[in-house]
């Protein structure tokens, strides 16, 4: 049996919760509403001139040096990468530089380099990305796009994921299994204790 376990498959599988939240409209594709706080200038998402985002992940020194070169920040000493006292001012400069071009312009300038860069894609853009499409990274289940199972096993392929459920879709069955009668379920719903 061949185990096909690409890193990108694992990334998509980790997005299963996001896919489910998106299916029930608890997720916004606007990165401004889905962010993590980082303090360094080399591991962060930045807004571009068009309001879209790119993300940087140049943790290793060689990649950081390439990122600085590609951003044309030639006066920044790559040897000071981990000097956190430099980070606030440099992060502001990186943000200003990234804001000078659109996301697509940054893709053209940085894709294929060792700058550890990626565009921040919406869920639909990620599914349509040529690399992800070539790997069949996403599947359609009852009109819902979901990450394909990972890892991929040649002799024992995984089952397709099931479609996401609506909030409260299985409430009656679960409460009945727990021994609650119909009157108890009505009271729980009236008290907004369940959907």
PLM features per residue range, with description:
Residues 111-161:
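A glycine-rich dinucleotide-binding beta-alpha-beta segment and adjacent secondary-structure elements
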Residues 78, 141-189:
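Flexible, small-/acidic-enriched active-site or ligand-binding loops
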Residues 78-91, 121-128, 144, 184-195:
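Short linear loop/turn motifs
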Residues 1-54, 58:
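Active-site-adjacent "lid/gating" segments in soluble enzymes
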Residues 37, 41-113, 117:
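Aromatic-enriched alpha-helical interface/lid elements that frame and gate functional surfaces
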């Amino acid at each position: 049996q061949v185990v096909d376990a690409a890193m990108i498959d694992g990334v998509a599988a980790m997005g299963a919760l996001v896919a489910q939240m998106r299916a029930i409209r608890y997720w916004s594709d606007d990165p401004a509403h889905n962010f993590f706080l980082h303090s360094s200038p080399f591991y962060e998402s930045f807004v571009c001139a068009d309001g879209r985002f790119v993300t940087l992940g140049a943790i290793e020194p060689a990649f950081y040096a390439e990122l600085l070169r590609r951003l044309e920040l030639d006066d920044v000493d790559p040897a000071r990468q981990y000097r956190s006292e430099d980070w606030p001012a440099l992060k502001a400069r990186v943000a200003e530089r990234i804001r000078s071009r659109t996301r697509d312009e940054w893709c053209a300038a940085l894709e294929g380099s060792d700058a550890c860069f990626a565009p921040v894609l919406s869920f639909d853009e990620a599914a349509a990305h040529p690399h992800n499409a070539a790997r069949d990274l996403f599947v359609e289940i009852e009109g819902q796009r979901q990450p394909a199972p990972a890892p991929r096993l040649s002799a024992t392929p995984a089952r397709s994921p099931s479609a996401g459920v609506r909030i409260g879709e299985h409430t009656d069955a679960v409460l009945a299994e727990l021994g609650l009668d119909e009157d108890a379920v009505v009271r729980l719903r009236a008290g907004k204790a369940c959907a």
